Amino acid sequence: MSKGTPSLGKRHNKSHVLCNRCGKRSFHVQKKTCASCGYPAAKLRSHNWATKAKRRRTTGTGRMAYLKHVSRRFKNGFQTGVAKPQSA
């Protein structure tokens, strides 16, 4: 049996399964870490050499249900809904 490409066809076991955090098939079974997002580390895995990957998962690629309204509220001084007292 050869060492290189022919022996790669003999592999059957999965080394990566689905990750609980990012959902990709990048969670290494033996290492117990995700190759994509770094789970179970507290902070998300990101590197400067992977600019495209950063662009895919950065702020603004999702719904931004809260953040998209912040700039407008900042412009108005974060009003609370209570009218200002009238000064005579």
Curated annotation (Swiss-Prot):
GO CC terms of this entry: cytosolic large ribosomal subunit
Any one GO biological process: translation
Record carries keyword Glycoprotein: no
Keywords of the record: Metal-binding, Ribonucleoprotein, Ribosomal protein, RNA-binding, rRNA-binding, Zinc, Zinc-finger
Residues holding Zn(2+): C19, C22, C34, C37
Gene3D superfamilies: 2.20.25.30
Keyword check for Metal-binding: yes
Entry-linked PROSITE patterns: RIBOSOMAL_L37E (PS01077)
Family matches, as Pfam families: Ribosomal_L37e
GO molecular function, one term: zinc ion binding
Cofactor: Zn(2+)
SUPFAM superfamilies: Zn-binding ribosomal proteins
Cofactor binding summary note: Binds 1 zinc ion per subunit.
Residues in C4-type zinc fingers: 19-37
Family: Belongs to the eukaryotic ribosomal protein eL37 family.
Listed PANTHER family: 60S RIBOSOMAL PROTEIN L37, RIBOSOMAL PROTEIN L37
Function: Binds to the 23S rRNA.
Protein name as it appears in the record: Large ribosomal subunit protein eL37
Organism annotation: Debaryomyces hansenii (strain ATCC 36239 / CBS 767 / BCRC 21394 / JCM 1990 / NBRC 0083 / IGC 2968)
Taxonomic path: Eukaryota, Fungi, Dikarya, Ascomycota, Saccharomycotina
